Amino acid sequence: MSYPLMISLIIEHMIGLTDAVFLGRVGDVALGACALGGVYYMAMFMLAFGFGFGAQIIIARRNGERRYNRIAPTMVQGCYFMLVLAVALFAASQYFSPIILRDIIESPQVYGATVDYLHWRTYGIFFSFLCVMFRAYYVGITQTKILTVNSIVMLLSNVALNYCLIFGKGGFPAAGIAGAAIASSVSEAVSLLFFIIYTSMTADKRKYGFRRAFTLRPHLLKGMLSISGWTMVQSFISVSIWFIFFLAIEHLGERPLAVTNIVRNISALLIMVISAFATTAGALISNQIGAGEQRCLFKTCGMTLKLTYAILIPLLIILCLFPEPVLRAFTDSPSLIAASVNSVYVMASSTLIMAPSFILFNAISGTGNTKAGFIMEMISLAVYTAVIYYGIIRLKPDVALCWFSEHVYGVTLIILAWWYLKSGKWRGKKV
């Protein structure tokens, strides 16, 4: 179950990665603006991701309880909510983003490019938010193989459109960073269309309750929000703090920002491996609790961590032995490659800490006690923000040292999550 999800997450991340690869040939400003715009967009997307993760917990629990006819109504009510949320965020972003970013981005060139990117990128909200619900459905019912196929279709469309729209190939005008944003949004529309067609053709509509799922059910949505509300806020704040990290780096200069964007894209590939296993652990734990097997929680976490390290450690060894060839995929500038190597080493070591922190945190979410997870995340992020302020904004160190803030966040979350799970306070939580 983990491997198809892992592959799909890696492929989906490669949408942002291909933006960085293509824009790295345009210049440092475009590369840095892509980083800021990408994380800004991701903060909005994480509201949907948080809601979808809560919906996934509920779907997985119903699947474990064998109450299959409750699954499709949960998914459809989630889609209704996602559409309303997408409209609200799109309107707010189009109006307020230029005003907000003008006051917090120092470089006029980076500001202009970031606004251009976001103007077109936010159109993808409508498609990506609905895709989150389809992903929650397939992960919740433990049928994740289709996610890989969907992600491949999305990636191929994104690569082709990036090439045409950024550089002006195939009869299209050269749109630069705006072209990258348009390509990403259109590829998400392709992904949604694929999900709709596949689900309508293959889903067991009677078993999962699709035939009567489209009636608006406010009481069901209210129950979903009681679980998903905490994960929504937690996910949004988590990435918003990551945006603050990028803003702190931007104040160090355009070159450190370009370095950080490259390292972020490499880091995100590794985090996708961790996230796939952690998400699977959360879904399995929710299924196990639904089936009355709470005792399996720690065994599931331990097995998941071993499998994660089995893939992660060889990748880290290769990355640390050969950082320059990996960096060359993002830029052809020798000076930018040289400036990024030390940051790669620090980032690589942080992923070893992120693996257990993500798995333990998702285990808490799998128990259904998302409020406890929210509190732990807020404490960890408060510590992380303090490190960003004092360690980056005040001290202005070399960009590689800035990446040690990831270690602090990971260790804090491990301590809190381990304490909570060992306390047994999660037992008996109803979903």
Regions found by a protein language model. Give the residues of each.
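Transmembrane helical elements of multi-pass membrane transporters/channels
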Residues: M1-G16, W120, M154, S187-S191, ...
